């Protein structure tokens, strides 16, 4: 069924398709239809449950940040069977983002390229929505980024302001210093700059607090960031974000578009970083990048991820993707003799 709908949707510009999808989910959430379709999409099995950074996840498959930037449809997304939802990225200031077109499909590669630029309604508006709207029963996190116009030196105050507006209603906070689409943002992954941001947020009461790292960091820089996270007692690390690098295997003309690449081509690289991070910390790792099948999710779990997230796979696989992954994970756990997902975390380390 999704194949027919996908053909129609893929005939439209990617961002138009996203807006149509979001509008449909918004209506479903408003009228309560998400509660009905949740019965079709949700896999309920205690073996899938994971406890990480103070939260209980009914299953390890989450919706990554970027899909619901303004926290408009978390209940509708949870109804698709996801075990957690991460909204955002949210910035202190309202931002239009970069000029369109800024989202591109690479269908032969099951990939996307985006240069959205943290387009969102701003912390005041998103925070008010989070405070006013009921949230789903699964954990909801918020991804926060730096406003484009804020100088790098003022980043700690910028992030802290955003947290003060959006942090109370959610279950965890992710500091995004790794998007390639805000000028200079990745410079904040340096130890001193990152420490200033994280310490300011901790002083403001942000907890659980995680940091999201880039797959393009040199291993020494990743090791430094993990060491800092350990020293500060962060609650977890998200590995990874999109990459600006392009594998030679990409065949679509849009592969040359500026922006971050996500989807199948970054799966192995993301898993390598999950493993690298997990070997250096006792804190939970969130694995992101190229998760589209149960095998993809299981690979990251065995490499050290407590939970995983996806976005691009929802575009290509449709609304059943979380259900298929969770059903497949149960089969993989049974095959390998694990009693639960938690037992499989880090099995390959």
Swiss-Prot record:
GO molecular function, one term: dihydroorotate dehydrogenase activity
Catalytic activity: (S)-dihydroorotate + a quinone = orotate + a quinol
Location of the active site: 179
EC numbers, comma separated: 1.3.5.2
The family this protein is said to belong to: Belongs to the dihydroorotate dehydrogenase family. Type 2 subfamily.
Cofactor: FMN
Gene that encodes the chain: pyrD
Keyword Hydrolase tagged: no
Ranges of biased composition (kind: Basic and acidic residues): 245-255
Compartmental location: Cell membrane
Topology term for the membrane: Peripheral membrane protein
InterPro entries: Aldolase_TIM, DHO_dehydrogenase, Dihydroorotate_DH_1_2, Dihydroorotate_DH_2, Dihydroorotate_DH_cat, Dihydroorotate_DH_CS
Keywords: Cell membrane, Flavoprotein, FMN, Membrane, Oxidoreductase, Pyrimidine biosynthesis
Name of this chain's protein: Dihydroorotate dehydrogenase (quinone)
Positions of region (Disordered): 244-265
Involved pathway(s): Pyrimidine metabolism; UMP biosynthesis via de novo pathway; orotate from (S)-dihydroorotate (quinone route): step 1/1
Xref: SUPFAM superfamilies: FMN-linked oxidoreductases (SSF51395)
């Amino acid at each position: 069924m999704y194949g027919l709908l996908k053909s129609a949707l893929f005939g439209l510009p990617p961002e138009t398709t996203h807006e149509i999808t979001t509008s449909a989910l918004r209506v479903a959430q408003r009228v309560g239809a998400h509660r009905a379709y949740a019965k079709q999409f949700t896999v309920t099995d205690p073996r899938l449950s994971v406890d990480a950074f103070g939260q209980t996840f009914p299953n390890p498959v989450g919706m990554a940040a970027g899909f619901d930037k303004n926290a408009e449809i978390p209940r509708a997304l949870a109804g698709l069977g996801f075990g957690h939802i991460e909204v955002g990225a949210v910035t202190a200031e309202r931002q239009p983002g970069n000029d369109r077109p800024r989202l591109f499909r690479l269908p032969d590669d099951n990939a996307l390229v985006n240069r959205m630029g943290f387009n969102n309604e701003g912390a005041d508006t998103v925070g008010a929505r989070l405070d006013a709207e009921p949230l789903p029963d699964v954990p909801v996190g918020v991804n926060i980024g730096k406003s484009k116009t804020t100088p790098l030196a003022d980043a700690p105050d910028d992030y802290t302001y955003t947290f003060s507006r959006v942090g109370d209603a959610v279950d965890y906070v992710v500091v995004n210093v790794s998007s390639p689409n805000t000028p200079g943002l990745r410079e904040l992954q340096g130890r001193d700059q990152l420490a200033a941001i994280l310490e300011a947020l901790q002083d403001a009461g942000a907890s659980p607090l995680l940091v999201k790292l880039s797959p393009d960091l040199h291993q020494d820089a990743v090791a430094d960031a993990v060491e800092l996270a350990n020293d500060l007692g962060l609650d977890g690390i998200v590995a990874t974000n999109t990459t600006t690098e392009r594998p030679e295997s990409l065949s679509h003309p849009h592969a040359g578009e500026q922006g971050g690449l996500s989807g199948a081509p970054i799966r192995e690289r993301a898993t390598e970083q999950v493993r690298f991070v997990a070997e250096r910390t006792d804190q939970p790792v969130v694995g992101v990048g190229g998760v589209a099948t149960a095998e993809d999710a299981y690979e990251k779990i065995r490499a050290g991820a407590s939970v995983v997230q996806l976005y691009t796979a929802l575009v290509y696989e449709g609304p059943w993707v979380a259900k298929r992954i969770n059903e497949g994970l149960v089969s993989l756990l049974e095959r390998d003799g694990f009693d639960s997902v938690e037992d499989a975390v880090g099995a390959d380390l």
